[in-house]
A protein has these predicted regions:
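Catalytic activation segment of kinase domains across protein kinase-like and atypical kinase folds
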Residues: 274-298
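Active-site activation/catalytic loop segments of kinase-like enzymes and analogous catalytic loops
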Residues: 298-338, 354-371
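Conserved N-terminal boundary motif of the eukaryotic protein kinase catalytic domain
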Residues: 102-110
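Amphipathic alpha-helical interaction surfaces in cytosolic regulatory modules
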Residues: 18-94
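ATP-binding pocket architecture of kinase catalytic cores
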Residues: 109-222, 259
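An alpha-helical support segment within catalytic cores of ATP-dependent transferases
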Residues: 165, 216-267, 271, 277, ...
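Short beta-strand/loop segment at the start of cytosolic alpha/beta domains
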Residues: 1-14
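ATP/Mg2+ or Mg2+-diphosphate-binding catalytic cores
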Residues: 341, 357-403
Length: 403
């Protein structure tokens, strides 16, 4: 059976059962009649979720559609049909997406929280990152693309081997996307520090080295990695609903003072979204990666590890005192070898830049509780408005931080 739907100029053709000699003639006629009625077609998608079998006559229908429509894809392909498409080479000449497995994380241990979702341990070999509600497939693909680019540039980044749908634990929730990673005996950096507090110094050095490794990588032009400053500006614009124009202007003033740069930045490097595997640090959350000046990256991490607003241990995974001590040791290692006065100046610069992230993170969701929003407004007055003369003076020194 073949059904055809369209929304505007976007067409979805759904196949069910068998697409073979007995059914393909009727299916092809139906498709042709419906498509001829349309003035223009922007995209054409074939949904194969219920397609059980495809023969050469069915393949000819797909090939004909692919030749006539530039934006063409076949989605939700079941294993037995995908095998046919792969064997015949169709997966190389058109976009073909497998049907996603559906998994539940009920009963799975929560091991990490990042800017875009939560990480659970599925079993001894694999973990799953579950994206927050509202994340689109386009967002998921973007993160996979950024992860691959960061990996190619030299970052220790885990690459997902499967996209799945995560079944909600109750009826009020929607299905979410998840990424599966194979990480043997891996745990979060936060959990590792709680289990091995005596290794805080060693971990702080590795954390600092991870930052330095990233910040030595220059992002080439023309890739998919976006400008971190432009992304930050968009987030500030997104929170205008919560803050008056004067407050927005203060945040933009800090942002506009940050020097230009093309270094690779993670922008959410904190202890609950970095994994430890065989003593090495591994990144799995690349949803905010961008390029720019390291000052912005370190400011983001300071806002999490030192000046986080809200429940610190729930978000970061360790007590605030341990997290701040860890950060202080790590930043000393990051600046190791620089004159003491330079280090002191850069620490002040990082603290000032963190004042942006302390509030721009509200752009990550449209459903934060009113109590959280009010706490942020109160803290803005304390951390930014009342100190703005001092902040402006520190901003004048940003240009001293040359790359």
């Amino acid at each position: 059976m073949t059904t055809i739907q369209h929304s505007g100029n976007d067409v979805i053709i759904s196949f069910a059962g068998h697409l073979d000699t007995a059914t393909s003639v009727e299916a092809n006629l139906k498709i042709s009649r419906e498509l001829e009625k349309m003035v223009s077609i922007d995209s054409l998608t074939c949904d194969a979720m219920k397609l059980e079998y495809i023969s050469s006559s069915g393949l000819r229908i797909l090939l004909s559609l692919a030749k006539r429509h530039k934006d063409f894809r076949v989605i939700n392909v079941q294993p037995q049909v995908y095998e046919v498409l792969e064997t015949t080479g169709f997966t190389k000449i058109m976009t073909v997406e497998r049907a996603m497995r559906r998994l539940s994380v009920e009963g799975c241990k929560l091991i990490g929280i990042g800017s875009v979702g939560k990480v659970y341990r599925l079993d001894g070999d694999t973990i799953i990152k579950v994206f927050r509600e509202g994340t689109t497939m386009e967002n998921v693909r973007r993160e996979i693309t950024l992860s691959k680019e960061a990996f190619v540039l030299g970052m220790p980044t885990a690459i997902s081997f499967d996209i799945v749908k995560v079944v909600p634990s109750n009826q009020d929730e929607e299905e979410r996307y998840g990424l599966i990673y194979e990480l043997l005996k891996a745990t979060t950096l936060g959990a590792y520090l709680k289990q091995h507090p005596e290794q805080i110094d060693e971990c702080a050095r590795k954390y600092a080295d991870l930052f330095k490794q990233m910040h030595e990588i220059e992002v080439p032009e023309g890739g998919n990695i976006p400008s971190a400053v432009q992304h930050e500006r968009q987030q500030i614009e997104h929170i205008r609903r919560y803050f008056p124009e004067e407050s927005i202007s203060m945040m933009l003033c800090i942002l506009d003072s940050i020097p230009a740069g093309n270094q690779l930045l993670h922008l959410d490097l904190q202890t609950k979204n970095v994994m430890v595997q065989d003593g090495q640090l591994m990144l799995i959350d690349m949803g905010e990666v961008g390029y720019g000046h390291p000052l912005l990256d370190l400011g983001h991490s300071y806002s999490s590890m030192v000046s986080l607003i809200g429940d610190y241990e729930k978000t970061i995974g360790i007590p605030r005192e341990l997290g701040q001590r860890f950060w202080n040791q790590a930043i000393e290692y990051y600046f190791e070898g620089l004159p003491a006065e330079t280090i002191e100046e850069r620490k002040k610069q990082i603290e000032v830049v963190s004042c942006i992230r302390n509030f721009s993170w509200l752009a990550l969701s449209d459903s934060f509780p009113e109590t959280v929003i009010e706490e942020c407004k109160t803290m803005f007055d304390e951390r930014v408005a009342q100190r703005f003369d001092y902040i402006k003076e520190v901003c004048k020194t940003f240009s001293n931080w040359t790359l």
